[in-house]
UniProtKB/Swiss-Prot annotation:
Organism: Janthinobacterium sp. (strain Marseille) (Minibacterium massiliensis)
PANTHER family linked to this entry: GLUTAMATE--TRNA LIGASE, GLUTAMYL-Q TRNA(ASP) SYNTHETASE
Name of the featured protein: Glutamyl-Q tRNA(Asp) synthetase
Pfam families linked: tRNA-synt_1c
Family the entry assigns: Belongs to the class-I aminoacyl-tRNA synthetase family. GluQ subfamily.
Co-factor(s): Zn(2+)
Protein task: Catalyzes the tRNA-independent activation of glutamate in presence of ATP and the subsequent transfer of glutamate onto a tRNA(Asp). Glutamate is transferred on the 2-amino-5-(4,5-dihydroxy-2-cyclopenten-1-yl) moiety of the queuosine in the wobble position of the QUC anticodon.
Swiss-Prot/TrEMBL GO biological process terms: glutamyl-tRNA aminoacylation; tRNA modification
GO molecular function, one term: zinc ion binding
Annotated residues for binding of L-glutamate: R8, F9, A10, P11, S12, E44, Y183, R201
Classification via HAMAP family: Glu_Q_tRNA_synth
Keywords: Aminoacyl-tRNA synthetase, ATP-binding, Ligase, Metal-binding, Nucleotide-binding, Zinc
Highest rank taxon of the organism: Bacteria
């Protein structure tokens, strides 16, 4: 890893930005600016079933209101399917077709991963059962007794972490039953193609990190530095999202929204009178905590 810094904010266009997504955007923006680096924006619409019309425009307009200027072109995942296909073909010795339904995997009672998904028991690892047709394509992970099964990484917010793919996830999906590429493959390909060196995102994506590092290694890609910041919760302790009733940000009062997000990220800032001044003091405060890492 060189001294250059390329970070990114990668929202899904499933609705307008809310308080939780502003925290993620702010953390990634502050970290990039504190390191005198680039801050990219990527629209992660690989799951086209969740895409909301005009959401991308609304997201970009909101970032502009908050004074967050991106570097380079905005990359859109749905326009990059050839790259994902090429990466999939490079993994041909590790991937296999799977005919299992979600119910069948859940009924295996092998357990549930930290992100709520059932751990895959390896049913189709050695071939499809009689009468089964391929629904998804999975990538084989190392067995629990193999030396490279444990994925170790240093998280810049949480410290040293280890994920065991065999026992915590199992072989995971690269191509979905509906024909769309899985998030894990798309994000790894995009980060490598855009030369992303630092990933700052919410802890809701922490459980994906082991899978992504594994794919990076199998594809010969460099592994970025990771930081997983706390996520905003709703009144009943659920991650704030469009699905849990998150309200759109108040673009008429951007300073109020920025200050709330900064407080959530444990930044103690003096009163400011403009968005430009907010970013000046916020970047300086973030740099004092993280710019030497």
């Amino acid at each position: 890893m060189t001294n250059k810094y390329i970070g990114r904010f990668a929202p899904s266009p499933s609705g307008p930005l809310h308080a939780g997504s502003l925290v993620a955007a702010m953390a990634s923006y502050l970290d990039a600016k504190a390191h005198q680096g680039q801050w990219l924006v990527r629209i992660e619409d690989i799951d086209e079933t969740r895409t909301v019309a005009d959401a991308t425009t609304a997201i970009m307009d909101a970032l502009a209101v908050f004074g967050m200027q991106h570097d380079g072109e905005v990359v859109v995942q749905s326009q990059r399917k050839d790259l994902y296909q090429a990466a999939f073909e490079r993994l041909k010795d590790l991937v296999y077709p799977c005919g299992c339904t979600r119910r069948e995997i859940a009924d295996s009672r092998l357990g549930v991963a930290a992100d709520g998904a059932a751990i895959y028991p390896g049913t189709c690892r050695h071939g499809l059962a009689a009468g089964k047709t391929a629904r998804t394509w999975r990538v084989r992970v190392p067995d629990a007794n193999e030396n490279n099964e444990a994925i170790n990484f240093d998280d810049r917010w949480l410290g040293p972490l280890t994920q065991h793919l065999a026992s915590e996830v199992g072989d995971f999906v690269l191509k979905r039953a509906d024909g769309f590429w899985a998030y894990q493959l798309a994000v790894v390909v995009d980060d490598a193609d855009q030369e992303v060196t630092h990933i700052v995102r919410g802890t809701d994506l922490l459980e994906s990190t082991g899978r992504q590092i594994y794919l990076q290694r199998m594809l010969g890609f460099p592994t970025p530095h990771y930081m997983h910041v706390p996520v905003v919760l709703n009144d009943v302790g659920e991650k704030l999202s469009k699905q849990t009733g998150a309200l759109a940000l108040d673009l008429a009062h951007p300073m109020d929204e920025l200050m709330k997000a900064a407080r959530f990220l444990e930044l103690s800032l003096p009163p400011v009178n403009s968005i430009t001044e907010f970013w000046r003091v916020a970047i300086a405060a973030w740099a004092r905590r993280f710019a030497q890492e």
